[in-house]
Amino acid sequence: MVMTDPIADFLTRIRNANMVYHDKVEVPASKVKRAIAEIFKNEGYVKDVEYVEDNKQGLLRIYLKFGPNREKVITGVKRISKPGLRVYARKEEIPKVLGGLGVAVLSTSQGIMSDKAARKAGLGGEVLCYIW
């Protein structure tokens, strides 16, 4: 079956694993997914991200993070720009997720970065997803 939106599939796998308290989730790897996962790690939403070679495209193993009493660190993940409806934001229009508590992930001309990094660099781009 052909996958029309691999990023949405990636986010859904993370969301589903988080909802049932799995410690890790494996997703087919790509450069974009790896960059998004690294942003999630740098922002403190996941514990670790590792690339696993499997003689195909590879796998990303993402270790999810939970609080001391197993409370979820990731409350929600949402795909914004979809194949059927792309969403772009100029540098002045970069959205704040939950008033700054969440993170927007953008694809800019300088690569994939968080909303804070894009504002600092003065770049706009395609709004890929929100995580909070």
UniProtKB/Swiss-Prot annotation:
One of its GO terms (biological process) is translation. One of its GO terms (molecular function) is structural constituent of ribosome. InterPro entries: Ribosomal_uS8, Ribosomal_uS8_CS, Ribosomal_uS8_sf. Transmembrane segments: none annotated. GO terms for cellular component: ribonucleoprotein complex; ribosome. SUPFAM superfamilies: Ribosomal protein S8. Keywords: Ribonucleoprotein, Ribosomal protein, RNA-binding, rRNA-binding. Disulfide bonds: none annotated. One of the primary rRNA binding proteins, it binds directly to 16S rRNA central domain where it helps coordinate assembly of the platform of the 30S subunit. HAMAP family: Ribosomal_uS8_B. Belongs to the universal ribosomal protein uS8 family. Part of the 30S ribosomal subunit. Contacts proteins S5 and S12. This is Small ribosomal subunit protein uS8. It comes from Heliobacterium modesticaldum (strain ATCC 51547 / Ice1).
